[in-house]
A protein has these predicted regions:
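C-terminal functional extensions of proteins
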Residues: 95-152
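Alpha-helical elements of the RecA-like P-loop NTPase motor core of helicases
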Residues: 7, 73, 134-135
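Short acidic, glycine/serine/threonine-rich loops at helix termini
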Residues: 10-12, 33-35, 74-77, 105-107
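Gly/Ser/Thr-rich loops at beta-strand to alpha-helix junctions
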Residues: 1-6, 69-71
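Short, solvent-exposed amphipathic alpha-helical segments in soluble enzyme
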Residues: 14-15, 77-82, 109-112, 141-142
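Short, acidic/small-residue loops that bind anionic groups at enzyme active sites
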Residues: 19-30, 65, 79-103, 118-119
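Acidic/glycine-enriched connector segments
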Residues: 4-64
Length: 152
């Protein structure tokens, strides 16, 4: 992934000697393989739908940073899967950067015009800090994962 936030996350994982997965899309004008991705875990896709399938399949949470059409496509795909309960696992969906997203997305208008339900606005969380994102993710995971020492 890259450039920007995705590249920084991958570089951080690499610097910490952690494994990380690269799910690249072959495009004529961008997205060369990130040199910090774990080589055996670097995959290239021709079709967007296959790339999105794998990142949703592997993810426990998705944090979406400001981006363009591809970012919006990924956000709405994940949100649709969560809304329609096509995912059989909980998924914390986070929009990072409230001021950006409030200008780009007017989901309240969709509620006003009846194209989405007001409850759909609860399918994701908008945040401005790492601490807010972390608290939301851990809260979502605690809803479904047993706590240490708990019996099943």
């Amino acid at each position: 992934g890259g450039p920007g936030v995705m590249e920084a996350a991958i570089r951080g994982a690499s610097d910490a000697k952690g494994l990380n997965v690269g799910l690249n899309i072959s495009l004529p004008h961008e997205q060369a393989a990130n040199p910090h991705v774990t080589r055996e875990l670097n995959f290239e896709f021709h079709y967007f739908f296959m790339r999105k399938f794998w990142f949703v399949y592997l993810a426990k949470a998705i944090v979406i940073f400001p981006g363009g059409f591809g970012t919006l496509d990924e956000f709405f795909e994940v949100l649709t899967l969560v809304q329609t309960r096509k995912l059989r696992k909980p998924m914390a969906v986070i929009l990072y950067g409230k001021s950006y997203w409030s200008e780009i997305l007017n989901l309240d208008a969709m509620v006003k015009y009846g194209t989405i339900d007001p409850a759909d606005l609860e399918l994701f969380k908008s945040v401005d800090s790492v601490d807010e994102a972390f608290a939301y993710i851990t809260g979502k995971m605690e809803e479904v994962l047993p706590l240490p020492g708990a019996s099943l």
